[in-house]
Amino acid sequence: MRSSGALKSSPAATGPEPAPTPADSVDAIPPAAILLVDNGSLEPRATLALRALAARLGTALGQPVDPVSLLHSDRVPTARLGGRPAEILAPALERRARAGRNELLVVPLFFGPSAGLTSFLPRQVSALGARFPRLRVRAARCLVDPAASADGRVAGMIADHVRAAMTGSGAPPAVILVDHGSPTPAVGAVRQHLAGQLAGRLGSAVRAVLGASMERRPGPAYAFNDPLLAQAFDRSGFGEGDVVVALQFLLPGRHAGPDGDVARICAAARRRHSGLRPATTELVGAHPGLVDLLADRSREAMTFAPLQA
C-alpha cells in the first residue's frame, strides 16, 4: 500500500501507457497540503481548539495539518489568538496555490454535508481553477455518513461522553442529543441517525434518547430541526430526574461551552422543572478517537478524484 501522501494518477484514455519518468511517477507527486477545515466561529476558543486538533492530526499522519475555517474566524482579534491570525478558506487556498502547492486535501471537521461543503467549497475551487489550472483539491468525507451504517465511531464517542456524565444515582437518565441546527435536511438526518445509533449503544442504561437542535429557521420546511433544546425539556420524560445533554458539537463556541447557550438553557429548564437534574457532556472534539477517525478520512481521500475546477 502506498503512503498516505501519494496521490493516484489517472491512466491515459487511449494508447499504451508510457514508461513512468520521475516527473510522471505517482511517488514523485509531493504530499498534499492538508487543511483541517471547520465552519468558523467568532469565539477565540474555537480557533485555538481547531489548532490543537490539527496538531494532533498532523502527528497521526506524519505531516503538517493546517487549521482553516470556512468563514468568520478571521474577524477574531489576533491578540486573542496568541498573535497568530486565523485563516479562512478562500485566501488559504489561493495562498497555497500561489506558492505552488498544487495538491491540496480538505479534511472537513463537520458531522454532515452542510452547504459550506456541498456549495461554498466547490465554488471556491472553481473560481481558483481558472487562475491556477494545475491546482487539485480533494475533499475527505464528513465524520458521519448515514449510508455507511456500520460505522458507529462518532456515536461511540458520544456514548462514552454520556456514560462519563451519568451520575450513577440509580434510575437511568434520559438523553438529549443536541446539535447546532441546519437549514439542510441531510444535516438534520445525520443528527437523527446518530440519535438512533446512540440509543442502540446505550441500551437499557438510559430511559430514552431524543434528538434536538439549538436553532432553526421559521416555517414548516425546517421542522426537521425540532424540537429545539429548550422545548425538549418540556417533553414527557425529559423534564424530570437525570437528563444528560449530549453535545453534538466539535469545538467550543456560542452554543457549546461552560458559559454558552446550552448551559443557559439547562439552567432555565432547571428553574421550570423542580425535579430536573440536567448534565452536559464533553465536546466530541475532546474525544481521543476523533483524531483516528480524521486520519482515516484523510488517508482514504488521497485516492479520491479532485473537485471539479
For the regions a protein language model found, what residue spans apply to each?
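Extended amphipathic ligand-handling, pore-lining, and cofactor/metal-binding catalytic surfaces
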Residues: 1-309
